[in-house]
Amino acid sequence: GRASEVLYYDARGNEQAQRAKAVIVCGNGAETPRLLLMSASDQQPDGLANSSGFVGRNLMFNNHAFVNAVFEKPLNDYKGVQVTRIIHDFYENDEARGFYGGGGIDVRALWSATPILHSELGMPPDVPSWGAAWKDEIAHNFTRQLSIVGGTTSLALDSNNITLDPENTDEHGRPSIRVTYLDHDDDLAMAQFLEDRAMELAEAAGAVKAWRGGVGPTTWSAHLLGTCRMGDDPATSVVDRDHRSHDVPNLFVCDGSSFVTSGRGQPTMTIMALAFRAADRIKAAAAAGDI
């Protein structure tokens, strides 16, 4: 079947319907599978576009390691471009490490992008969260601090997924998201490797103080990937190489959920590139009467 309309809630909380010749879903790796799973019907009882059973599966969080460093003189890293320095020396997999994975290291303001963010997430572990010492640290170190960030592999695991919560609902009574996630041991080992290299870089650069963010189970992410994977085989993927659903020919998914692997760094530019590519393919299909 084909998608014919989208139901949504307006600003007053009233349900509305929008007819459409084509539907493009861009809700990221969490809200996109949630929407498709909530759109189950008699024709597609396991969720819209989910004949493969892969909607919501293989969630990837884009693993990272962090080191913060303070220097003697101001860096003013909060000004201008956020990321200007990138290292790819450790990008490729190296069997000599004893685990799978790779990644890049970039240097950026990150927690020192704004004073408020710095006070929340950029403080050294020995500084209290309030009082004179807290104020002194912000006043002196905000312009002198930078973060060294290692972006590494997050392996696609069938056990990591987005499902509909059977108990909790949102304000409209719709099922909330349930997230199930546990890092692969190799992902954590690679993150530890990059954290160690980041500490070496901070020390070699002359940091007067440096501390680790700490490597452990991933409990948050800005990058939600993999839950509506792209592929040629409808039995093992949700969308084809043009981001078109295998099951619903006028439904497209254009966000990080189409990733089959996490990559080894920031995914945003890849998501943007795929979105431009998908737009060209959708335009061509529409012109050919194929939507």
Tell where the protein language model's regions lie, with residue ranges.
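A glycine-rich dinucleotide-binding beta-alpha-beta segment and adjacent secondary-structure elements
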Residues: T143-S154, D158-S159, R174-S262, T268
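FAD cofactor-binding and catalytic pocket of flavoenzymes
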Residues: S52-I177, D185, L224, H246, ...
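A residue-level signal for conserved active-site and pocket-lining positions in enzyme catalytic cores
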Residues: L59, L164, A198, M230, ...
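A conserved short coil-to-beta-strand element within the FAD-binding core of flavoproteins
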Residues: G1-S4
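A conserved FAD-binding loop/helix module that cradles the flavin
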Residues: T261-I282
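A structural signal for well-ordered alpha-helical segments within the folded catalytic domains
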Residues: A30-P33, Q192, D196, M269, ...
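Glycine-rich loop(s) and the adjacent beta-strand/alpha-helix scaffold that form part
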Residues: V6-K79, D255, L274, D280-G289
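Short, ordered coil/turn segments that flank beta-strands lining enzyme active or ligand-binding pockets
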Residues: A11, E171, R241
